[in-house]
Amino acid sequence: MNKIYLAIIALLALTSCANTYEIKGTSNVSTLDGRMLYLKILKDNNFKSIDSCDVLHGQFHFQGNLDSVKMGNIFMDDEPVLPLVLESGDITVKLDDAQQIVSSTPLNDKLFKKKKKYQQLQNQQRELVHKHDQAIMNGSDMNVVTQKLNAEAIQLSEQEDKLITNFVTENFDNVLGAGVFFLVTMGNQYPMLSPWIEDIMSKATDNFKNDPYVKD
């Protein structure tokens, strides 16, 4: 009887550990030190705080229990700092002036691998502005330059749309699909049906369509 009791206790302990997360963060951003960070999730169409901590000597820490995997976001006051997936395990967050990375758990690794590719495309788009300004300084034919840069901008925009569309559709049935869809469209003041959104919705599963990140 005692062996059975101990086995049950051990199983409950393992189950409890399997449904917990711990976020260990580091930052070299001087303006963050001494500030309060909030861990929030979307609930009833609003971000609700589920934990908070101070950044002390470039370190911060969150932990908690999970009933299911969720998308979360770290906020400073009312400003979102970065998204992440709340899933079981030890989650590592790194904030610095050059980049923001969440790693060490499967879905976070997947999310930030794709985020890195997205940022590379955005950097290339910003570089087009530099090329335009440099061409003016060099006295180049701006009609030719503008035509070339516009073509490059269209190509980069199409690559961005394809990157997002493929990532969302590949993750229809986990939190990444709806979560990334929400992050990309949350800045829209009104509902918009751009071609890439129409493409996603035409392929979407019921699970995706009924997710609060999409439905609301």
Question: Where do the language-model regions lie?
Answer:
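Sec-dependent N-terminal signal peptides
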Residues: 4-14
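Intrinsically disordered, low-complexity regions
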Residues: 11, 63, 161, 165, ...
